From Swiss-Prot:
Disulfide bonds join C20-C31, C25-C39, C30-C65, C49-C73, C67-C80. Gene3D superfamilies: Lipase, subunit A (2.10.80.10). This is U1-hexatoxin-Iw1c. InterPro entries: Atracotoxin. Belongs to the MIT-like AcTx family. GO terms for cellular component: extracellular region. It is found in: Secreted. Its main location: secreted. The lineage of its organism: Eukaryota, Metazoa, Ecdysozoa, Arthropoda, Chelicerata. Expressed by the venom gland. Residues 86-88 form a propeptide. The keyword Signal applies. The modification Pyrrolidone carboxylic acid is found at Q18. Keywords: Disulfide bond, Pyrrolidone carboxylic acid, Secreted, Signal.
Length: 88
């Protein structure tokens, strides 16, 4: 039984992690590319952000992470805000 629990934990950890250069990004973070790749926390209210659709094929973002759940990246100001994800 302990072995089954251990296998489940390993699977859960591997699905929530993202390889980012020499680091592995966990939940609540993304891989942001500057001169090198770095794990950064997801952008919060009024932080600068990238849109989820701006991820590279490898899942990395340029400079900033997308917003945390419940927020969206306003493409006019490039900051995380509440409300609809449509630009108006």
């Amino acid at each position: 039984l302990k072995f089954v629990v251990l296998i489940c934990l390993v699977i859960m950890a591997s699905t929530s992690a993202q390889q980012c250069g020499d680091e592995t990004c966990g939940a609540g973070t993304c891989c942001a590319v500057f001169s090198q790749n770095h794990c950064r926390r997801l952008s919060q209210m009024y932080d600068l952000c990238s849109d989820h659709s701006d991820a590279s094929p490898s899942g990395n973002y340029l400079f900033f992470c997308p917003c945390e759940p419940g927020l969206h990246c306003d493409r006019n100001t490039w900051t995380c805000t509440e409300g609809s994800s449509r630009s108006e």
